[in-house]
Amino acid sequence: MQTSPDLTSARSVIRLLLFAKSRAVVAELEEHLRQHIQGLPGQYPAQLEVVPLEEHPYLAEHYKLVATPALVKAEPLPAQVLAGADLATQLEVWWPRWQGQAALAAHQEGAGRDPASPPTTEALLQMSEEVFLLRQERAQLREQLDFKDRVLAMLVHDLRSPLTATALAVETLQQGREGSLDKALERQLFDHARQQLRKMDSMITDILESARGAASELRIRAVETQLPGLCQAVIEELWPRIQGKRLQFQADIPVDLPSVHVDPDKIRQVLFNLLDNAIKYTPAGGSIRLDVLHRTSQKVQVTVSDTGPGIPEADQESIFSDSVRLSRDQQQEGYGIGLSLCRRIVRAHYGQIWVESSLGKGSSFHFTLPVYRLCKR
């Protein structure tokens, strides 16, 4: 834990703080200023201390610093900031006035008077640090609350469609209980209702996982898993939607893939989310690919590609943040948290996830998983 600069000496000492990004950056300037101060006339000494901004960011806010290096006369009050190329020259210009302020402070202390009873610099800086930390905490809480509000609003909107579709299917089945529906239509309605219920379940699962927060750890129960079967199950679940948009779908999943060491339920979520996004953003008649490759002896790589609108290069990293929702998403169902959840799951398996995309040419999402035999004990 970093300690605040020592600012507890008498007010008659001229206390100088040299702000810089780090100590190493201003080592030469610090030595130059110390030698320069020793050559200045005056009764009252100066104490110079280097303050690295990376250790005390709240001090930069307290003194309203806009550039570094900067020299701050912290005591006697009032504080004064010097900035620019030639701090030694500025110090020499202000030195007589600072000597006068130190003399006045010493006289008032000697007379038993507290000059205007101002808070000590130590107290001011401690309060500044507390205010800085409180502002940070408030900003983080506000961001979390805003995100939860957006999620709730989108959840209400997105659940309405599958709920309505399920209700219509159930009502139709209920009306046809007396035999007015043929078996093929009944089976189609049951399948449609089941598909919509799974869709709602997936939405709610994503919401619950996201609500745990980025800092929480996922509970991973890794076991030996065959990826071909897992991929096939997800494809079958999404197949009605693929057919409904007349999408061309291709899969290249070698039968001799090694087993992977994963939590099958969590990896199913990743596959479902990536394929669901590909279906969502690929226009009718477009194409989607699912490729699984034994990349190295240690990893298997999974790739989901589409011919959708693509993702701007500037957004290709931020899309994995739980608070980002691209402009292309505004007319689509979703929460802007699916990819964030995918990243958390993949990283929890010690894998990587990334995207390659060009505007107007589609996107390819890749992620890696550990091969099972390397995890045996």
From Swiss-Prot:
Entry's EC annotation: 2.7.13.3
GO biological process, one term: circadian rhythm
SMART domains in alphabetical order: HATPase_c, HisKA, KaiB
Highest taxon listed in the record's lineage: Bacteria
GO MF entries: ATP binding; phosphorelay sensor kinase activity
Modified residues annotated as Phosphohistidine in this record: H157
Free-text function comment from the UniProt entry: Member of the two-component regulatory system SasA/RpaA involved in genome-wide circadian gene expression. One of several clock output pathways. Participates in the Kai clock protein complex, the main circadian regulator in cyanobacteria, via its interaction with KaiC. KaiC enhances the autophosphorylation activity of SasA, which then transfers its phosphate group to RpaA to activate it. In addition to its output function, recruits fold-shifted KaiB (KaiB(fs)) to KaiC to cooperatively form the KaiB(6):KaiC(6) complex (independent of SasA kinase activity).
Description of its domains: The N-terminus interacts with KaiC, while the C-terminal histidine kinase domain autophosphorylates and is probably responsible for self-oligomerization. The N-terminal domain stimulates the C-terminus to autophosphorylate.
PANTHER family: HYBRID SIGNAL TRANSDUCTION HISTIDINE KINASE C, TWO-COMPONENT HISTIDINE KINASE
Protein name: Adaptive-response sensory kinase SasA
